[in-house]
């Protein structure tokens, strides 16, 4: 979904997408990192309205991220003071040729245990 949008932007300009898109794991991680940071900054600008955006504003922007899906390449992400991962989701994939094929749904392993450990550490 989001990768198709990127390919369409390149195609519109008569170009091929970057060859790095073929190695989907690393490319997708980069897309995810950029998209999450952009969403945090958008939230910061929306919350502040005007004036200079500070690091604290962006931090609050991260914490305002709720149910962020990025066009289907990840489960709904939610950030909190204790959870900067976005929810602790995982998914198992199998390599078939040049592709990664999901063989499980998105799962959350022992989230209650992880959150309790984080609370004890703070």
Kindly label every feature range from the protein language model.
Residues 1-122:
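Extracytosolic ligand-binding ectodomains
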């Amino acid at each position: 979904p989001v990768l198709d949008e990127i390919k369409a932007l390149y195609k519109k300009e008569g170009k091929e997408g970057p060859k790095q898109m073929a190695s989907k794991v690393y490319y997708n991680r980069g897309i995810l990192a950029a998209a999450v940071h952009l969403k945090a900054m958008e939230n910061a600008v929306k919350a502040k309205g005007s004036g200079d955006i500070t690091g604290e504003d962006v931090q609050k922007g991260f914490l305002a991220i709720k149910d962020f899906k990025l066009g289907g390449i990840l489960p709904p992400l939610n950030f909190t003071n204790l959870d900067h991962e976005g929810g602790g989701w995982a998914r198992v994939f199998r390599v078939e040729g040049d592709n990664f094929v999901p063989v499980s749904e998105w799962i959350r392993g022992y989230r209650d245990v992880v959150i309790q450990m984080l609370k004890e550490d703070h």
